[in-house]
Amino acid sequence: MSKVFDAKVLAVYMVAPNTYYMEFDAPDIARLAVPGQFVHVRCGETNDPLLRRPISIHMVSRPKGVLALLFRVVGKGTEILSQQKPGDRVNMMGPLGRGFTLPLPGSKVAVAAGGIGAAPLVFLVQELANIKCQVTVYLGARDKRSILCDGQFIQMEAEVVIATDDGSLGFKGTVPELMKRHMDWRKTAMTYVCGPGIMMKEISTMLAEADVPGEVSLEERMGCGVGACLSCAVKISHHGQISNKRACFEGPVFPSWQVVWE
């Protein structure tokens, strides 16, 4: 069950343009969290901004009780959060949402990340490494400076293949284009995806055509974070029936073949 905590900031620094890494002393969240879940963060001490911000869990250290977040500054709330200092306290709810489904130990899996979508996938690859999975990470961004988490994935002994839109690092093109050239669909037991909607839509179509199971982590605007306000509803198809599901409660992770992409 998720709870509300005042977590002490342990570290904060910029890792890429407008992108920040933060560590918190949050033993209860670190103990309970699974890959794909998020925390709902109160970014300041006043009511401006009023709403909390959902931020995916980047990594945890359960022995140390440390929670790590990786986020991009996109507005007032995340800008305020990025200005916190070690020793400050940040109010957060968590862990929230449905996380990723882990495959059988030793499985060959693919992980596709675009931009800040790499953030929740580090925790996932950490857990996949713990069960001896063979992991290939398809990592993309606009340019070399915007590539995130490649070093962390490599430290976890994942194979990392990079694509940049401008060709400044790795393959010139998109992550879906890279996967078409590189991926062995027949030997892939599971694929996990997080990134821009257009990327996730294209990869989901590819997975359906190859009959490969996959899960996507959706990044939706959220109000309450606990399923009450319905502001994060997404269309899901199940056995031919389309219904609205709450990204904060039934998600943010959904089977790739169930998402009705706009």
UniProtKB/Swiss-Prot annotation:
PROSITE patterns: FAD_FR. [2Fe-2S] cluster binds at C224, C229, C232, C248. One of its GO terms (biological process) is 'de novo' UMP biosynthetic process. Keywords: 2Fe-2S, Cytoplasm, Electron transport, FAD, Flavoprotein, Iron, Iron-sulfur, Metal-binding, Pyrimidine biosynthesis, Transport. Residues 2-102 form the FAD-binding FR-type domain. GO terms for cellular component: cytoplasm. It is found in: Cytoplasm. Its main location: cytoplasm. FAD binds at R53, P54, I55, S56, L70, F71, R72, G77, T78. Gene3D superfamilies: Dihydroorotate dehydrogenase, electron transfer subunit, Nucleotide-binding domain of ferredoxin-NADP reductase (FNR) module, Translation factors. This is Dihydroorotate dehydrogenase B (NAD(+)), electron transfer subunit. It comes from Desulforamulus reducens (strain ATCC BAA-1160 / DSM 100696 / MI-1) (Desulfotomaculum reducens).
